[in-house]
Amino acid sequence: MSRIAATFERLRGQRRTALIPYITAGDPYADATVDIMLAMAGAGADVIELGVPFSDPMADGPVIQKASERALAKGIGMGQVLAMVRSFREHNDTTPVVLMGYANPVERYGIDRFVADAKSAGVDGVLVVDYPPEECEAFAAQLQGADLDPIFLLAPTSTEQRMKDVGRIARGYVYYVSLKGVTGAGHLDTDAVATMLPRIREHVKVPVGVGFGIRDAATAKALAAVADAVVIGSRIVQLLEAEPRESVAAVGGTFIASIREALDSSTEGVRA
């Protein structure tokens, strides 16, 4: 059983919703990423999504786009991202880490090399935003062969066929993009999410995490009744970008602790 699957199984037994924060590797300080990851894990993050910086992050809004630009300006590439995961693993061997990014950095690094190095670094899952499931079965199989979970996106516009395609090859969890558009945009409609998730679960048997538009504890708590996981990205990146180096990890940890408390106070709807 993968580290991600084991985490969700444990949480299911506890009737708790997973908390999955996202940060961009190397932002806001190249030497702070591991400290932020450790602080978030210590504060109650169940899985950490670590964004690989890319110059054209088409699915991301201005907050994460700027974070990518800042990280790239510091020289953060795939090699540096994997080194951060290795460093994190020296202190934490239990919290799953998912690399989230785009095809270009993976292919530029070399797919075979990426899979091997991600495994050796201690990565648990990979989400490539612009790899549609129907076109990357070989890549998904290669990841699974290295005990890495291939993770995919679904959206309000996803067809039944897309859900079936994702359900066939996804492992770990599926990330449901709860809003049309880019990350950090719009207002989250929890009723619409609650209507959509049963449709997804007809085809997808791994846990379903919900992201995009989650900015505070109240929204996260509302989603805890229907989602297996809550994913928060833009709000965290926004909080961290304004912090000085000496306090950035603590601020990240404090925010995660507030979300964790909200999720744990609303367990009645979590699926057994």
From Swiss-Prot:
Pathway, per record: Amino-acid biosynthesis; L-tryptophan biosynthesis; L-tryptophan from chorismate: step 5/5
Pfam family, one: Trp_syntA
Alphabetized InterPro entries for the sequence: Aldolase_TIM (IPR013785), RibuloseP-bd_barrel (IPR011060), Trp_synthase_alpha_AS (IPR018204), Trp_synthase_suA (IPR002028)
GO cellular component: cytosol
Enzyme class: lyase
Classification via CDD domains: Tryptophan_synthase_alpha
Catalytic activity: (1S,2R)-1-C-(indol-3-yl)glycerol 3-phosphate + L-serine = D-glyceraldehyde 3-phosphate + L-tryptophan + H2O
Keywords: Amino-acid biosynthesis, Aromatic amino acid biosynthesis, Lyase, Tryptophan biosynthesis
Record bears the keyword Amino-acid biosynthesis: yes
Active-site residues, as the UniProt record annotates them: 49 (proton acceptor), 60 (proton acceptor)
Enzyme Commission code: 4.2.1.20
Single GO term (MF): tryptophan synthase activity
Family: Belongs to the TrpA family.
Job description of the protein: The alpha subunit is responsible for the aldol cleavage of indoleglycerol phosphate to indole and glyceraldehyde 3-phosphate.
UniProt subunit comment: Tetramer of two alpha and two beta chains.
UniProt name for this protein: Tryptophan synthase alpha chain
Species: Methylibium petroleiphilum (strain ATCC BAA-1232 / LMG 22953 / PM1)
Record gene name: trpA
